[in-house]
Amino acid sequence: MRRLVKLCLFLLFCASSIKVIAQTLPNKTLYVHVSAGLARSEDGLKFMVKESASQWTPKANLGIGYRFNKYLGIETHAATMLTSLKANGTLVLNNEKAEVTARHSNVMISPKFYLPLGDKSELFLRTGLGFLLSQSEINSPSNPDFKKSTSNIGYMVSLGYAHKLTEKIVFTLQFDFSDPYGSKDVWEGDLGLLNAGIKYSLNHKK
């Protein structure tokens, strides 16, 4: 995590030498942000000798935000996996074959820091705190339908790029990294997400 934060700060520092001209959305703008992409979770399956795993899944995001000025905004956002993570293997406890599935989602609130690069582009850093939700299931011969839901409070850090398409529409590309989801007895792991999306201004008229 420290390496990720250092990388974010380094990129923002390097970009600070570029002449600032404008920004993708004006000050005092309320907007919606819709995006989708691919998420990858660390498996964290210490209770099972893993034979195979599917750790990639599509994920959808929806948020609403407000831009205070050229450099600062705030965003509340939620995301969910569209398919489940899956793993197959042998349980350490009783040597039974088992299948594990998990699906993660989150609800976050995040300050957002902008660095305009030109008249249509900018970098942004989003650092948030909220709920990391997980639904896991373990199927084995002795326990065919074990389910567990978890809700953790954790952080999410996002680094992204935005490009203005029109006066009201902005294209975004970002990478998100979060605290671990789940718990040690089911599926636990950090989550990384690369996604592309659109921001749409709700109150900017021009």
Located regions from the model:
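Transmembrane beta-strand segments that form the barrel wall of outer-membrane beta-barrel proteins
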Residues: 36-40, 44-46, 132, 173-181
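Predominantly the C-terminal beta-signal and adjacent terminal strand-loop region
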Residues: 77, 81-88, 104, 155-206
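A charged, solvent-exposed segment within the mature domains of Sec-exported extracytoplasmic proteins
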Residues: 128, 132-176
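Residues that define the transmembrane beta-barrel architecture of outer-membrane proteins
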Residues: 28-30, 54-60, 101-107, 149-155, ...
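Cleavable N-terminal export/targeting peptides
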Residues: 1-28, 203-206
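Extracellular loop and loop/strand-boundary signature of outer-membrane beta-barrel proteins
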Residues: 46-51, 93-100, 141-147, 181-186
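Gram-negative (and chloroplast) outer-membrane scaffold detector with strong preference
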Residues: 25-31, 36-42, 66-140, 194-206
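Start-of-domain marker
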Residues: 33-35, 43-57
